[in-house]
């Protein structure tokens, strides 16, 4: 993750989350500082009264919203920064000198010298529930102060996160007021303050209620008094008070006023709801054991609100559960429970308070209800602020004797139990809200606590459901399409015992074709793309992992754009951003154009997103245009501004983003122009509306909006009387709705809807002009129940609210508000499902389906920062995929592709690499890490290089070792803290990653020290450290093979500085520049351990042992029934998988494992059933015992039958290809089948088998074509591939099509075989197969691209080595190599008859391979032909070089020439060859020189009898002649002389090989020729003469003729 995402996550994660909160950039005001709940009385509020804390470097100001105010007193404050100063005696705890910091809040303590001495917050960033410091009381330093911050979302935090990140232990900071430096003492005030203990907002079931609290700084004689609802309350000496209030049914507002000399100085209101309908018939109380029996025999008592009733969703109550409820009760994690036995003794307390501290929350806990006893459960919304959970946690101890009271009298628990016996309960297995894609749903669960099942009945919507004696039930329930509300009720003898309701959205026939949309946020990603290649590689990786569409953020929140052609608005380009965490984009690269270019190449949809009503970043102080348009800025009405309406950036309460007014016509027009300039200048597929909303409920209250609201009201006969009070006002910090509040919600929502209508009109107009569809979509928060606060109804106008949806404010949903739904203006919608569990995501997805009424495709937006752990990510992804049209992944900077790719495919992620870090003090050991260049995951050790981002993002409680580009440790933050386990002053561990270096980063879960102490003890400043990742070994672990040897292939990625070396079983393996390596391993029967060790600059970083099993009975190959499938969208079929053994084959369909490599196109389940999801092509694979088979699936929308691949003429796809030259492959049988298997070396091999009938028809269709090519493709990236063709059919058809070309291609290259050439070597009779193989030998991959690895042969020079091309015929399971159809010494005179037309033979060289020797042209008279190759993306024609050089080109670019037979023996002039002429000695020497690839000498030879212009002059000059100065050229070479000359050239060739650094490693065919083919080049056997006779092999004195020896054999090399 980028630094931005660590330091300021709200700038990356779409700020839809802000709709859940009201951020509090507080400024000191009269209301917020004193008048609510006591505290300081400031001067009149204004800009000059701002109170803020300045960071150490003076660059960051944190505004303070509350000063010496009990923020937990009613009304409880949220989204604040609060200041508590020494001596003020006002805190939010029971102690006047300590501030209560609850878990999930942040705080700092500053001493009297302005130095930060303590920081409290998360132990990991981004924080999770388990990575926060526990609840605690933070002492206020003498003469200093404490700052406390609270908000509800870390991702968009403007209080907690800035306080935690900008103020560090040891920093010297300063406190300011009105621009002047102040100190804690400046905020002291002698006036008393009010500290209410009684919580506001509670619901009670008793009319008798007590308000309690304390007057701080109280003293007698001050003229201080206090009233509760107008009645004066008695004040104790310490200012404490209690006042009884009689409640009425419904909501009660209790006024508490503090007066001085009769003048009100502080007031507060406590809101309490009295629910008389749900109260017990009598007052039921529990009484704890006496605190001090010498003082009072009675203990503290508390009312019990519910007896044997489900209290889920009910705040602030104590409930009693008896045996009537059941045998046990489940206590939620943050509740408190007390177990009491039949003798009224406490036997267990769940989440007790130890020594007055906040409980260490555990659970959920299943707690037994003792026979004859009971369980008390307390739950509330604030442990510190409400005395409910705290009551049970504090006053109840194991062994205490307690009492139950009814109307004041002690009673046994049985007196509180019902008379009907045990109460039956129903528990459901179903989620409370979910989406169903079938026409029915399965309801299942259990009825518990039944004393007599015959008296129990279960119904769903009134229909009886059967259940078993054990209470279990399972039934299928038919659903209506759309929303279904299901009410399940359990009755006992007709009386309701329990009920549950379900909300199910039914989408029968819902498309299973899923899109995966990747969001590329501007702020987090723009500067990473410095070149077009960066974009291409990024998108290619995304596509390979299942992404189908991209959303590119072209207008960020700051107002800068990611495109260059801002022809209508003149918006500045993103490279103009100055904020360090975002700056650095390439000013010369049009990012949008690059994204479009490569998206088109890869077949990805490209949509562009706009932060519509966002025009600046308050957090980063970046405003592209807003400072020039202050009238655009939102005017807000916040409680913190003391009743004033202010410009957003002048308000005491600010968010991270500066919004503009959606009601301003100039604003709207400018945003539309921004969209239009992109649509006119760029080829995009759609527009995404992001932040097309108001900032929050406080906006917009400008005069312009007021006038438009008045017009809106006038149209419905209403009038605005008081502005803004008719909308709402504030009582303290609590919003009080006015009479026009519902009109206001509707007005704002219709304002946003009208803008989406204008966008729709714009895109439709551009569509008509361009003739191209442009989709409109929106990205919104999934929390629809509160999104009205942002002025947005993103649903359908047909949506209707139901109580069972349990939304907070049902009054919002008026007929007019329903009309404001804008989903019909969209083509699809993305909802931010930022929840972190599958049930939560299911809930909000279903709510989205309900609200949108299924009218447009809906995609679940997943915040990747919340789901980094692989198992959780998989669960969340699948929850989103099952019930929506797909996923939107936010954001690209957060993606860990291996994890995300597995999660998208619903596969368990298995880390396919070993991360290792050297240990300075243990040279033979290493530290094994977990992940590299991914967001830090708790309880793991990671390595982060500068490709990850600017900094690590670790928290202040992590441990890191920072390693620079030289490999030296420069710092180890928190080393001492971890080793001593003293975290009083933690270091900053969000370390900047050195360029060219890396950081070892770790963090344990809270309270665990294992990983942190491991890293802290391992490294110290000055150590030399290296790191690497080893991969490739997984494929070999447990591999069973019958091969004699296996080529082990792996890869090493060095992280940071250094050069790697690898050994495999003790033998050094050649390491290529890209980090790949290979080594041959001998396999013996049984277990064969293979040990791989990696060292970087000599430092050991990795060691891995895998075991390969040698087994003659192992599977040899795995086959699918087809290699390709053509299916209609929605069609399903089952794969059939066969395992082939040495002498048999077995159907393993039921045992194989399956996966789809393109899940958006085709899915496959665990049984092998594949389903076509959407048009396109995809690959499915089956795996069994280490072997894999793949098949290509082509999906169309056609209505014809599927199951075959007719070919497209492009040669694409698995086993694809087609008849060339316009020929079309007929429909019918499968054209090819594809099998993934192993070759004799244990390498992966792809076998493509052609169907005879289809092939014959295709060849027949070639007749008469201008370019008659029959092509086949070997799919995939395996090191070897074979195309198997039915030879009999091929020979028969090629006989009638002599001009046809057979073309076979793979990722390694391509080969073209003329029909006339093949015909000579194909048997005339009998059944056989032609096998055409393209592969890479182990030696090829070892030597390929090694410096100095130049090879020469046949008069040519080759850089590196090349793929092997082999042609065999197979008959009766035996293979026989065809006569040298290889790139050496091949002539077309094989059939004995001339070909009537020129033919071509070419090899297309892939970029990773270096050279090949193509066969000679079969055009008569052609001596050599340029090699056609492809390099760096474009075609290149290579001609033979004129001279040779022993140096390999550093990039591996081939310096090639031909290996034509006719370059070995030239003609005799005038176009003749003179085949019956005898060779002279000089000509024969030249023949050997060329055949052995020896460099010719300069033409000016020293031999006086050799003409300098003779074709053989340079070749002869390579060696001396028999006599000084003379070569005796006219002598006839004898067989003995030829043998002698061969030995001489052989020895010379061996010496020449030594000139090359890798000469000893050259084992491919090129190298075989170079290193002395000697024995096989000798002229043994019978030699046929022109006269037709022959001589025995032993004869040494025969003439050597020109024709036959020209086809010299070469030393045999291992087949491909």
From Swiss-Prot:
Highest taxon in the source lineage: Bacteria
InterPro entries membership: Big_2, Divisome_Glycosyl_Hydrolase, GHL10, Glycoside_hydrolase_SF, Ig-like_fold, Invasin/intimin_cell_adhesion, SLH_dom
Residues in SLH domain copies: 1438-1502
Location of the protein in the cell: Secreted, Cell wall, S-layer
Entry keyword annotation includes Glycoprotein: no
Composition bias type Gly residues, residue spans: 1199-1225
Basic and acidic residues biased stretches: 1536-1554
Annotated ranges, domain BIG2: 1115-1185
Presence of keyword Signal: yes
Biased composition (Basic residues): 1372-1387, 1594-1616
Ranges annotated as biased composition (Low complexity): 1406-1416
Listed GO CC annotations: extracellular region; S-layer
Renumbered residue ranges of the record's region Disordered: 1191-1244, 1372-1455, 1523-1554, 1585-1616
Main subcellular location of this protein, as a coarse class: secreted
UniProt keyword list: Cell wall, S-layer, Secreted, Signal
Residues in the signal sequence: 1-30
Pfam families noted in UniProt: Big_2, GHL10, Glucodextran_B, SLH
PROSITE patterns cross-referenced by the UniProt entry: SLH (PS51272)
Function as written in the Swiss-Prot or TrEMBL entry: The S-layer is a paracrystalline mono-layered assembly of proteins which coats the surface of bacteria. May play a role in the export of butirosin from the organism.
Name recorded for this polypeptide: S-layer-related protein
Organism: Niallia circulans (Bacillus circulans)
Gene that encodes the chain: butB
